[in-house]
Amino acid sequence: NARQLGKERIMELDERWIKLKGRLPEADQIMNSKVSALLTAAMNKQSYFKEAILTGNQGETVAMNMVTTDYWQGDEEKFTAIFDTNLPSRKPDSHISRARWDDSTKAMIAQVSVPVYDGDYMIGTLTVGVDLKRVPHPNH
């Protein structure tokens, strides 16, 4: 969030991102960040973790373990269900999506989203995609 982009710039970048399927310098810059490296390392610890997306306070992607299908997450339920600029927040402290096919991960996933705070201020969200076919069953 240190580098705030205007809404117009976010939308322009999102449009280019979708059109070029994430093959652009901005996606490379995000993927090569230290935070993206940490997300990638965490996701590699379990085979059922498929994706991790860290957003800023406008829903823009600021870190990821793999290139996402779009840059702006701000219009998606994983962001809108939990992000709140009001203090105290009146939204849930987590969100679990319905299972769905995900083109980025090529798997049937559920997304678990939580808010990210800096002190008392909600500064973004973290979403983790979980491959439901790989989650260990407690009876096996």
Indicate residue ranges for each PLM-predicted region:
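Extracellular/periplasmic ligand-binding regions of membrane signal-transduction receptors
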Residues: 1-34, 60
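Short N-terminal helix-loop-first-beta-strand/juxtamembrane motif that initiates sensory/input modules
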Residues: 1-7, 41-60
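Extracytoplasmic/periplasmic sensor domains and loops in membrane signaling proteins
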Residues: 21-39, 66-100
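Short coil/loop residues immediately preceding or within conserved phosphate-binding loops
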Residues: 49, 94, 111
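Residue-level detector of beta-strand face positions
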Residues: 53, 98-100, 115
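Solvent-exposed loop/turn segments at secondary-structure junctions
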Residues: 58-61, 68-71, 102-105, 130-132
